[in-house]
Amino acid sequence: METGSTLSDIFSQLDVKMPYPPVSAKVNNKVEGLHYRVYNPKDIEYLDVTSASGSRAYTRTLFFVLCKAVHKLFPESNVVIDTPVSNGYYCDLRLGRPVTEADVDLIRSEMQSLVDRHLRIRRHQVPTDEAIRIFEDLGYKSKAMLLRTTGKLYTTYYDIEGFIDYFYGTMLVNTAQLTLFGLEKYYDGLLLRIPSRHDPTQLGALVRQDK
């Protein structure tokens, strides 16, 4: 393997059979995204969406794609990922008016378009002071305030086609890896549905409950 290859590149050169494609990996027992570059010999265990870490990476990336879709369709709005409910996540979509079924259909369609276009998800690591400036310039005041509290010298953020955001944890490397998701109107917001860890070819069962 070439020194500095990503975990994604390494997997593509291995003859390894997995029930489902990898979405992250344990490197010397520490969870890393498939963007991670390997420069020295490491113990690597690839993880799919049936693992807790893999499911979180998949879900986190869905959040990112949802945020990008909302930003394109409703640039003056805001979406907040809220509580886990009904085998998914309740999302508070702040449009300044009630959310309609038509809104949800538009967002779902835009998310699917982002997946179908097989877009790279780029990882950036910069000094935290620089990241704070970037998010302040974009008007993401709450994200900038959050970064001020991390106490870290460097911050990792991600972008899809120039749309950037900060998430704590690993992400997938391409939108095409999001093979299954659901988005539905749920009370006065959205329900983002994710694949079942027991059977990732199916969405988690929809059980309507209080958000």
What do the predicted segments below correspond to?
Residues 36-55, 78-84, 90-211:
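Auxiliary tRNA-acceptor-end handling modules of aminoacyl-tRNA synthetases
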